[in-house]
UniProtKB/Swiss-Prot annotation:
Organism, scientific name: Prochlorococcus marinus (strain AS9601)
Pathway: tRNA modification; tRNA-queuosine biosynthesis
Lineage: Bacteria, Bacillati, Cyanobacteriota, Cyanophyceae, Synechococcales
Any one annotated GO CC term: cytoplasm
The name this protein goes by in its record: NADPH-dependent 7-cyano-7-deazaguanine reductase
Record carries keyword NADP: yes
Keywords attached to this entry: Cytoplasm, NADP, Oxidoreductase, Queuosine biosynthesis
Coarse class of the protein's main subcellular location: cytoplasm
One GO biological process term: queuosine biosynthetic process
Cell division in keyword set: no
Length: 136
């Protein structure tokens, strides 16, 4: 078996990488603006990189919100979240950045973002951020 380095024959960047790089959160009109209701979204495969070691950090993101005029389109949200996979960023900074983008794009009545980071080096971390006023 040859030990020569195999050349990558695929074109760079791959179409999936381009789509992720260009991603942004897209919203569409709330189909029932008169009703107060909650939507929960789970994103169990969030990844970013530790800004100090460069090692990957993994988390489960849970978003619960009460839509106002818009709701989040799920595929765009998935691609937006996947864009963080190669970014060196602290847990605190990335969760706050995601929350800012969610609030700015969707303008929900109320939103809660929970990020449960997997243990690394015997330490796990969970962040909870809220914005707006919850309605009953």
């Amino acid at each position: 078996m040859s030990t020569a380095k195999l050349e990558d024959s695929t074109q760079r960047p791959l179409y999936g990488e381009r789509i992720i790089e260009e991603s942004k959160i897209i919203c569409f009109d709330n189909p029932n603006k008169k009703r107060i209701y909650e939507i929960s979204i789970q994103l169990p495969e969030f990844t970013c990189k530790c800004p100090f070691s460069g090692y990957p950090d993994f988390a489960k993101l849970n978003i619960t919100y009460q839509p106002n005029l818009k709701v989040y389109e799920l595929k765009s949200l998935k691609l937006y979240i996947n864009n963080f996979r190669d970014i060196k960023i602290s847990h605190e900074e990335v969760v706050n950045r995601i929350m800012d983008d969610l609030v700015n794009e969707g303008l929900p009545h109320w939103i809660h973002l929970n990020a449960a980071f997997n243990p690394r080096g015997n330490v796990s971390m969970q962040l909870d951020i809220f914005s707006g006023q919850k309605r009953n």
